[in-house]
A protein has these predicted regions:
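Beta-propeller domains
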Residues: 15, 40-70
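Blade/loop signatures of beta-propeller domains
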Residues: 1-22
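A short loop-to-beta-strand structural motif that recurs across blades of beta-propeller domains
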Residues: 54-56, 95-97, 157-159, 206-208, ...
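Short, conserved, GDST-rich strand-edge loop motifs in beta-rich repeat architectures
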Residues: 133-153, 193-203
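Beta-rich, blade/repeat-based domains predominating
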Residues: 20-22, 28-43, 71-90, 94-95, ...
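Short loop/turn segments immediately following beta-strands, especially the blade-tip
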Residues: 209-217
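Short loop/turn segments immediately following the C-termini of beta-strands
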Residues: 50, 91, 136-138, 195-197, ...
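A short beta-strand motif characteristic of beta-propeller blades
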Residues: 22-27, 63-69, 106-113, 167-172, ...
Length: 265
Protein backbone atom coordinates (compact mmCIF):
# COMPACT_ATOMS: atom_id res chain seq x y z
CA UNK A 1 0.00 0.00 0.00
CA UNK A 2 1.32 3.40 -0.97
CA UNK A 3 0.42 6.87 0.27
CA UNK A 4 -1.40 8.80 -2.43
CA UNK A 5 0.38 11.77 -4.00
CA UNK A 6 -1.82 14.76 -4.79
CA UNK A 7 -1.11 17.89 -6.80
CA UNK A 8 -3.46 20.62 -5.61
CA UNK A 9 -4.08 23.25 -8.28
CA UNK A 10 -7.25 24.82 -6.87
CA UNK A 11 -8.63 25.06 -3.34
CA UNK A 12 -11.74 23.21 -4.50
CA UNK A 13 -9.62 20.07 -4.82
CA UNK A 14 -8.71 20.19 -1.14
CA UNK A 15 -12.33 19.51 -0.24
CA UNK A 16 -12.30 16.31 -2.30
CA UNK A 17 -9.26 14.58 -0.79
CA UNK A 18 -8.07 13.31 2.57
CA UNK A 19 -4.49 13.24 3.80
CA UNK A 20 -4.73 9.66 5.04
CA UNK A 21 -5.95 8.20 1.74
CA UNK A 22 -3.81 5.44 0.27
CA UNK A 23 -3.40 4.00 -3.21
CA UNK A 24 -3.52 0.23 -3.18
CA UNK A 25 -2.31 -1.96 -6.03
CA UNK A 26 -5.07 -4.50 -6.63
CA UNK A 27 -3.30 -6.60 -9.25
CA UNK A 28 -0.29 -6.68 -11.53
CA UNK A 29 0.28 -8.89 -14.56
CA UNK A 30 -1.93 -7.36 -17.23
CA UNK A 31 -0.42 -6.43 -20.54
CA UNK A 32 -2.92 -3.59 -20.79
CA UNK A 33 -5.57 -2.91 -18.13
CA UNK A 34 -8.63 -1.00 -19.35
CA UNK A 35 -12.37 -0.50 -18.91
CA UNK A 36 -13.09 -1.06 -15.19
CA UNK A 37 -16.67 -1.51 -13.96
CA UNK A 38 -17.74 -1.97 -10.34
CA UNK A 39 -20.62 -4.19 -9.24
CA UNK A 40 -21.80 -2.67 -5.97
CA UNK A 41 -24.21 -5.50 -5.15
CA UNK A 42 -21.51 -8.16 -5.44
CA UNK A 43 -18.64 -5.98 -4.21
CA UNK A 44 -16.38 -6.85 -7.11
CA UNK A 45 -14.59 -5.03 -9.91
CA UNK A 46 -14.03 -6.28 -13.46
CA UNK A 47 -11.69 -4.89 -16.09
CA UNK A 48 -10.22 -5.76 -19.48
CA UNK A 49 -6.75 -7.02 -20.27
CA UNK A 50 -7.23 -6.33 -23.96
CA UNK A 51 -4.17 -7.87 -25.71
CA UNK A 52 -4.38 -10.95 -23.44
CA UNK A 53 -8.05 -11.26 -24.44
CA UNK A 54 -9.48 -11.69 -20.97
CA UNK A 55 -11.58 -9.97 -18.33
CA UNK A 56 -10.29 -9.93 -14.77
CA UNK A 57 -12.25 -9.80 -11.51
CA UNK A 58 -11.20 -8.41 -8.13
CA UNK A 59 -13.33 -9.41 -5.15
CA UNK A 60 -13.45 -6.74 -2.47
CA UNK A 61 -14.64 -9.18 0.20
CA UNK A 62 -11.51 -11.35 0.24
CA UNK A 63 -9.00 -9.42 -1.91
CA UNK A 64 -8.69 -12.18 -4.50
CA UNK A 65 -8.23 -11.70 -8.25
CA UNK A 66 -9.36 -14.21 -10.85
CA UNK A 67 -10.12 -14.49 -14.56
CA UNK A 68 -13.74 -13.44 -15.14
CA UNK A 69 -13.94 -14.32 -18.85
CA UNK A 70 -11.48 -15.73 -21.39
CA UNK A 71 -11.39 -15.57 -24.32
CA UNK A 72 -13.23 -12.26 -24.25
CA UNK A 73 -13.30 -10.97 -27.85
CA UNK A 74 -10.88 -8.22 -26.82
CA UNK A 75 -13.37 -6.31 -24.68
CA UNK A 76 -12.48 -2.68 -24.03
CA UNK A 77 -14.82 -0.42 -22.02
CA UNK A 78 -17.64 -1.52 -19.75
CA UNK A 79 -20.48 -0.17 -17.70
CA UNK A 80 -23.22 -1.67 -15.54
CA UNK A 81 -26.85 -1.11 -16.52
CA UNK A 82 -29.77 -0.36 -14.21
CA UNK A 83 -30.49 -4.08 -13.83
CA UNK A 84 -26.93 -4.87 -12.75
CA UNK A 85 -25.87 -6.44 -16.04
CA UNK A 86 -22.51 -5.91 -17.73
CA UNK A 87 -22.53 -3.80 -20.88
CA UNK A 88 -19.39 -4.48 -22.91
CA UNK A 89 -17.64 -2.87 -25.87
CA UNK A 90 -16.02 -5.64 -27.91
CA UNK A 91 -13.13 -4.92 -30.25
CA UNK A 92 -13.00 -8.31 -31.97
CA UNK A 93 -16.75 -8.75 -31.84
CA UNK A 94 -17.15 -5.22 -33.27
CA UNK A 95 -20.24 -4.80 -31.16
CA UNK A 96 -21.82 -3.68 -27.92
CA UNK A 97 -23.02 -6.67 -25.93
CA UNK A 98 -24.74 -7.45 -22.64
CA UNK A 99 -23.65 -10.22 -20.28
CA UNK A 100 -26.24 -11.54 -17.85
CA UNK A 101 -25.41 -12.76 -14.33
CA UNK A 102 -25.62 -16.35 -15.65
CA UNK A 103 -22.96 -15.57 -18.27
CA UNK A 104 -25.23 -15.52 -21.31
CA UNK A 105 -24.37 -12.91 -23.94
CA UNK A 106 -26.64 -10.79 -26.11
CA UNK A 107 -25.40 -8.58 -28.96
CA UNK A 108 -27.13 -5.20 -28.67
CA UNK A 109 -25.54 -3.42 -31.63
CA UNK A 110 -23.09 -4.51 -34.31
CA UNK A 111 -24.13 -2.49 -37.36
CA UNK A 112 -25.09 1.04 -38.34
CA UNK A 113 -27.15 1.46 -41.51
CA UNK A 114 -26.22 -2.08 -42.53
CA UNK A 115 -22.46 -1.60 -42.08
CA UNK A 116 -20.31 -3.18 -39.38
CA UNK A 117 -19.27 -0.98 -36.49
CA UNK A 118 -15.53 -0.28 -36.18
CA UNK A 119 -14.64 -1.39 -32.64
CA UNK A 120 -16.82 0.02 -29.84
CA UNK A 121 -14.69 1.56 -27.11
CA UNK A 122 -16.74 2.84 -24.17
CA UNK A 123 -20.40 3.02 -23.16
CA UNK A 124 -22.76 4.67 -20.70
CA UNK A 125 -26.36 3.86 -19.83
CA UNK A 126 -28.88 6.69 -19.45
CA UNK A 127 -31.70 6.47 -16.91
CA UNK A 128 -34.21 5.79 -19.72
CA UNK A 129 -32.30 2.59 -20.56
CA UNK A 130 -30.68 3.91 -23.73
CA UNK A 131 -27.03 3.00 -24.27
CA UNK A 132 -24.63 5.58 -25.68
CA UNK A 133 -21.24 4.42 -26.99
CA UNK A 134 -18.17 5.52 -28.90
CA UNK A 135 -16.81 3.71 -31.94
CA UNK A 136 -13.22 4.61 -32.89
CA UNK A 137 -11.09 2.35 -35.07
CA UNK A 138 -8.49 1.13 -32.56
CA UNK A 139 -9.69 -2.48 -32.56
CA UNK A 140 -9.47 -2.81 -36.34
CA UNK A 141 -6.24 -0.86 -36.84
CA UNK A 142 -4.13 -3.94 -36.07
CA UNK A 143 -4.29 -7.45 -34.65
CA UNK A 144 -2.85 -6.34 -31.30
CA UNK A 145 -6.18 -5.47 -29.71
CA UNK A 146 -8.65 -6.99 -32.17
CA UNK A 147 -8.70 -8.09 -35.81
CA UNK A 148 -7.25 -5.77 -38.44
CA UNK A 149 -9.89 -4.79 -40.99
CA UNK A 150 -11.00 -1.81 -43.05
CA UNK A 151 -13.72 0.42 -41.67
CA UNK A 152 -17.03 -0.20 -43.41
CA UNK A 153 -18.50 3.05 -42.07
CA UNK A 154 -15.41 5.07 -42.97
CA UNK A 155 -15.59 7.31 -39.91
CA UNK A 156 -15.70 7.20 -36.11
CA UNK A 157 -18.96 8.25 -34.47
CA UNK A 158 -20.85 8.31 -31.19
CA UNK A 159 -24.06 6.28 -31.17
CA UNK A 160 -27.25 5.71 -29.19
CA UNK A 161 -29.09 2.38 -28.85
CA UNK A 162 -32.82 2.87 -28.35
CA UNK A 163 -34.05 0.85 -25.34
CA UNK A 164 -37.38 -0.05 -26.96
CA UNK A 165 -36.55 -0.72 -30.60
CA UNK A 166 -32.81 -1.41 -30.47
CA UNK A 167 -32.31 1.11 -33.28
CA UNK A 168 -28.78 2.50 -33.54
CA UNK A 169 -28.53 6.21 -34.36
CA UNK A 170 -25.46 8.42 -34.74
CA UNK A 171 -25.59 11.28 -32.24
CA UNK A 172 -22.17 12.85 -32.95
CA UNK A 173 -20.27 12.57 -36.23
CA UNK A 174 -17.54 15.22 -35.92
CA UNK A 175 -15.05 13.38 -33.71
CA UNK A 176 -11.70 12.02 -34.88
CA UNK A 177 -11.43 9.16 -32.37
CA UNK A 178 -14.25 9.35 -29.80
CA UNK A 179 -13.23 7.54 -26.64
CA UNK A 180 -14.46 7.83 -23.04
CA UNK A 181 -17.86 9.37 -22.35
CA UNK A 182 -20.11 10.18 -19.40
CA UNK A 183 -23.32 12.04 -18.65
CA UNK A 184 -23.60 14.94 -16.25
CA UNK A 185 -25.42 14.08 -13.04
CA UNK A 186 -28.68 15.58 -14.37
CA UNK A 187 -28.14 13.90 -17.78
CA UNK A 188 -28.54 17.24 -19.56
CA UNK A 189 -25.00 17.09 -20.97
CA UNK A 190 -22.80 14.37 -22.44
CA UNK A 191 -19.02 14.64 -22.12
CA UNK A 192 -16.95 12.86 -24.79
CA UNK A 193 -13.18 12.43 -25.02
CA UNK A 194 -11.45 12.60 -28.40
CA UNK A 195 -8.05 10.89 -28.68
CA UNK A 196 -7.51 11.67 -32.35
CA UNK A 197 -3.92 12.73 -31.61
CA UNK A 198 -3.02 9.03 -31.76
CA UNK A 199 -3.58 9.14 -35.53
CA UNK A 200 -3.42 12.80 -36.57
CA UNK A 201 -0.47 15.12 -35.96
CA UNK A 202 -1.58 17.84 -33.56
CA UNK A 203 -4.93 16.09 -33.45
CA UNK A 204 -7.50 16.32 -30.67
CA UNK A 205 -6.58 15.36 -27.12
CA UNK A 206 -9.53 16.86 -25.33
CA UNK A 207 -12.97 16.39 -23.80
CA UNK A 208 -15.94 18.09 -25.43
CA UNK A 209 -19.42 18.53 -23.98
CA UNK A 210 -22.77 18.56 -25.78
CA UNK A 211 -26.27 19.43 -24.62
CA UNK A 212 -28.74 16.53 -24.66
CA UNK A 213 -32.00 17.31 -26.47
CA UNK A 214 -35.22 17.70 -24.49
CA UNK A 215 -36.47 14.30 -25.67
CA UNK A 216 -33.16 12.69 -24.63
CA UNK A 217 -32.49 11.19 -28.05
CA UNK A 218 -29.93 13.49 -29.69
CA UNK A 219 -27.13 15.99 -29.02
CA UNK A 220 -26.44 19.60 -29.81
CA UNK A 221 -23.03 20.81 -31.04
CA UNK A 222 -20.15 19.62 -28.86
CA UNK A 223 -18.04 22.39 -27.35
CA UNK A 224 -14.52 22.18 -25.93
CA UNK A 225 -14.48 21.44 -22.20
CA UNK A 226 -10.81 20.68 -21.42
CA UNK A 227 -7.58 19.86 -23.25
CA UNK A 228 -5.22 17.22 -21.87
CA UNK A 229 -1.88 18.70 -20.83
CA UNK A 230 -0.03 15.37 -20.44
CA UNK A 231 -0.75 12.43 -22.71
CA UNK A 232 -4.38 11.79 -23.59
CA UNK A 233 -7.70 11.57 -21.82
CA UNK A 234 -9.29 8.13 -22.03
CA UNK A 235 -12.00 6.89 -19.68
CA UNK A 236 -13.56 9.18 -17.07
CA UNK A 237 -16.50 9.54 -14.72
CA UNK A 238 -18.28 12.33 -12.84
CA UNK A 239 -18.80 12.47 -9.10
CA UNK A 240 -22.05 13.60 -7.47
CA UNK A 241 -20.87 17.22 -7.49
CA UNK A 242 -20.25 17.20 -11.24
CA UNK A 243 -16.45 17.04 -11.08
CA UNK A 244 -14.79 14.99 -13.81
CA UNK A 245 -12.14 12.44 -12.83
CA UNK A 246 -10.27 11.38 -15.93
CA UNK A 247 -7.26 9.28 -16.85
CA UNK A 248 -4.28 11.17 -18.29
CA UNK A 249 -0.61 10.63 -19.04
CA UNK A 250 0.64 11.45 -15.54
CA UNK A 251 -2.17 10.14 -13.35
CA UNK A 252 -5.80 11.02 -12.72
CA UNK A 253 -6.86 14.60 -13.45
CA UNK A 254 -9.80 16.26 -11.69
CA UNK A 255 -11.79 19.00 -13.42
CA UNK A 256 -14.42 21.23 -11.87
CA UNK A 257 -17.74 21.60 -13.73
CA UNK A 258 -16.49 24.91 -15.17
CA UNK A 259 -13.59 23.12 -16.91
CA UNK A 260 -10.86 24.18 -14.47
CA UNK A 261 -8.14 21.61 -13.75
CA UNK A 262 -8.27 21.60 -9.95
CA UNK A 263 -5.93 18.74 -9.07
CA UNK A 264 -4.20 15.50 -9.91
CA UNK A 265 -3.59 12.13 -8.31
Amino acid sequence: MFTASFEILDERFERLIFGNVHLEKLYTGCRWAEGPAYFAAGKYLIWSDIPNDRLMRFDETDGSTSVFLAPALNHNGHTVDREGRLISCEHRGRCVSRIEPDGSRTVLADKYQGKKLNSPNDAVVKSDGSIWFTDPSYGIDSNYEGDAAPSEIGACHVYRIDPASGEVTAVATDFEKPNGLAFSTDEKRLYIADTGATHVKNGPRHIRVAEVSADGRSLGPAKLFATCTVGLFDGFRLDTNGNIWTSAGDGVHAYAPDGTLIGKI
